[in-house]
């Protein structure tokens, strides 16, 4: 199974005598059927993307041609690409971008909780702890200009404690 499409490696029958089972914009496709199948998951994707594709009820199989397979896959991946392009063109006015704390481990979340003395009940699960910490994280006031100025100053002066601690500040080359 590849992206919801059956590759046919699980199925040893040949499809050389079959045509695509899809009706494209009210016209039955006449292309040779490949090994990709028109599963319920793919049907759901087609419906969500409002493609004018439907399965021919007269067809005795669910195999589709390579053209329709590629068309469905391109619609599925186009959304991901569009999202990633949108992310790269973000402006500085979007101040509501927060890190994904749900990816952090429980020990890291607990360390944050201890450091900022966040009040929580005992025995919280990771997702609940991340929710509580995210609420606290959003309330922390920051002075962006001051932070950036301090960062640039520290870099120029070469006095970053973390670099010196890791041996990076003692560069002799």
Swiss-Prot record:
Residues in Atypical zinc fingers: 20-68
Gene Ontology terms: cellular component: histone deacetylase complex
PTM annotation (Phosphothreonine): residues: 91, 93
Family matches, as Pfam families: SAP30_Sin3_bdg (PF13867), zf-SAP30 (PF13866)
InterPro entries: His_deAcase_SAP30/SAP30L, SAP30_C_sf, SAP30_Sin3-bd, SAP30_zn-finger
GO biological process: regulation of DNA-templated transcription; regulation of G2/M transition of mitotic cell cycle
Region feature Disordered, mapped onto this chain: 73-94
One of the record's GO molecular function terms: transcription coregulator activity
Domain of life: Eukaryota
Subcellular compartments: Nucleus
Phenotypic consequence of gene deletion: Does not cause cell morphology changes, cell growth defects, cell cycle phenotypes, or loss of Smr/SMRTER protein from the Sin3A-histone deacetylase (HDAC1/Rpd3) complex.
Annotated positions of the Phosphoserine modification: 84, 88
Signal peptide interval: none
Swiss-Prot/TrEMBL keywords: DNA-binding, Metal-binding, Nucleus, Phosphoprotein, Repressor, Transcription, Transcription regulation, Zinc, Zinc-finger
Its biological purpose: Component of the class 1 Sin3A-histone deacetylase (HDAC1/Rpd3) complex (HDAC). Appears to be a non-essential subunit of this complex which is not required for cell cycle regulation of progression through the G2 phase of the cell cycle.
Assembly notes: Component of the class 1 Sin3A-histone deacetylase (HDAC1/Rpd3) complex (HDAC). Not essential for stability of the complex, recruitment of the complex to some promoters, or the deacetylase activity of the complex.
PANTHER family: HISTONE DEACETYLASE COMPLEX SUBUNIT SAP30L-RELATED, SAP30
Similarity comment: Belongs to the SAP30 family.
Protein name: Histone deacetylase complex subunit SAP30 homolog
């Amino acid at each position: 199974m590849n992206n919801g499409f059956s590759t046919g490696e699980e199925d040893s029958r040949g499809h050389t005598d079959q045509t695509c089972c899809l009706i494209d914009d009210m016209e039955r496709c006449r292309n040779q059927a490949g090994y990709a199948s028109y599963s319920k998951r793919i049907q759901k994707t087609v419906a969500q993307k409002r493609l004018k594709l439907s399965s021919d009820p007269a067809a005795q199989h669910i195999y589709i041609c390579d053209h329709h397979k590629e068309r469905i896959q391109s619609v599925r991946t186009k959304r991901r690409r569009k999202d990633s392009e949108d992310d790269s063109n973000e402006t500085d006015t979007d101040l509501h971008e927060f890190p994904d704390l749900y990816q952090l481990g429980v020990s890291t979340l607990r360390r944050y909780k201890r450091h900022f003395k966040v009040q929580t009940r005992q025995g919280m699960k990771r997702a609940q702890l991340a929710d509580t910490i995210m609420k606290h994280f959003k309330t922390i006031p920051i002075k962006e200009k001051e932070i950036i100025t301090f960062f640039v100053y520290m870099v120029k002066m070469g006095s970053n404690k973390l670099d010196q601690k890791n041996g990076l500040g003692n560069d002799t080359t």
